[in-house]
Amino acid sequence: MVAKILDGKQIAKDYRQGLQDQVEALKEKGFTPKLSVILVGNDGASQSYVRSKKKAAEKIGMISEIVHLEETATEEEVLNELNRLNNDDSVSGILVQVPLPKQVSEQKILEAINPEKDVDGFHPINIGKLYIDEQTFVPCTPLGIMEILKHADIDLEGKNAVVIGRSHIVGQPVSKLLLQKNASVTILHSRSKDMASYLKDADVIVSAVGKPGLVTKDVVKEGAVIIDVGNTPDENGKLKGDVDYDAVKEIAGAITPVPGGVGPLTITMVLNNTLLAEKMRRGIDS
């Protein structure tokens, strides 16, 4: 068996076309979604990622802006800029690029975003809504993972799903989304014992810990679906996933590559959530 390759680039391209159609329909009603991104400092990776988000938003017809503050910006300065965007009626969605400089509290900033404009889905109110199954902004990487599974026509009901990693950004929210699809979910983490026994029984494995080569062929059940969220640069700058891709693809039923798997869907879901934010505040059904 050779796994079906779950091409995130193509899935994202198809999904963005649907978003573009919805943006055009909104414009005909007189509304244009706008994404505002706050970037603090000059970290090269953050700058590149923010530019990618801006370009992607503009490509589907949205307005996008980057609010760039100096590395030395105080927490108060960041909060003031955030408050301005919260109160700007032209802004549909706001995200703050992390990591932030040490003098700025990431949690304090994330909690200051208007929950109705929180397109990253990290505000405590939106996290709470996710866990009581209310409509909300879902963190973008988990949302992208679910779109990949949907696109691949993976039936999750009754399946054993193992999530490696318990972060609030990926591990915990994707576990909740899998539960919503009636999968039986196990979360593994750095303190888990005998991880192999859980993995060998998994129909779906989502790995999101940033440890290259963690998931090997000998712990994967034949036909399992493998979602690799790992994104770690090696000594040559080449991105590596958590999964031993070349070996595991020989036994898995389906697998995401790194790069080109989950990554393209993460930015796509930022756009999805920005569109949702605009629709919700205008009283337009999704």
From Swiss-Prot:
GO biological process, one term: L-histidine biosynthetic process
Keywords of this entry: Amino-acid biosynthesis, Histidine biosynthesis, Hydrolase, Methionine biosynthesis, Multifunctional enzyme, NADP, One-carbon metabolism, Oxidoreductase, Purine biosynthesis
Any one GO MF annotation of this record: methenyltetrahydrofolate cyclohydrolase activity
Binding site for NADP(+): G165, R166, S167, S190
Origin: domain of life: Bacteria
Pathway this chain belongs to: One-carbon metabolism; tetrahydrofolate interconversion
Catalysed reaction equations from the record: (6R)-5,10-methylene-5,6,7,8-tetrahydrofolate + NADP(+) = (6R)-5,10-methenyltetrahydrofolate + NADPH; (6R)-5,10-methenyltetrahydrofolate + H2O = (6R)-10-formyltetrahydrofolate + H(+)
Disulfide bonds: none
One GO CC term, this protein: cytosol
Assigned EC number: 1.5.1.5, 3.5.4.9
Signal peptide range in chain numbering: none
Pfam family, any one: THF_DHG_CYH
Keyword Isomerase part of the UniProt annotation: no
NCBIfam families listed in its UniProt record: PRK14175.1
Purpose: Catalyzes the oxidation of 5,10-methylenetetrahydrofolate to 5,10-methenyltetrahydrofolate and then the hydrolysis of 5,10-methenyltetrahydrofolate to 10-formyltetrahydrofolate.
Subunit structure: Homodimer.
Similarity section: Belongs to the tetrahydrofolate dehydrogenase/cyclohydrolase family.
Protein's name according to its UniProt entry: Bifunctional protein FolD
Protein source organism: Staphylococcus aureus (strain NCTC 8325 / PS 47)
Lineage of source species: Bacteria, Bacillati, Bacillota, Bacilli, Bacillales
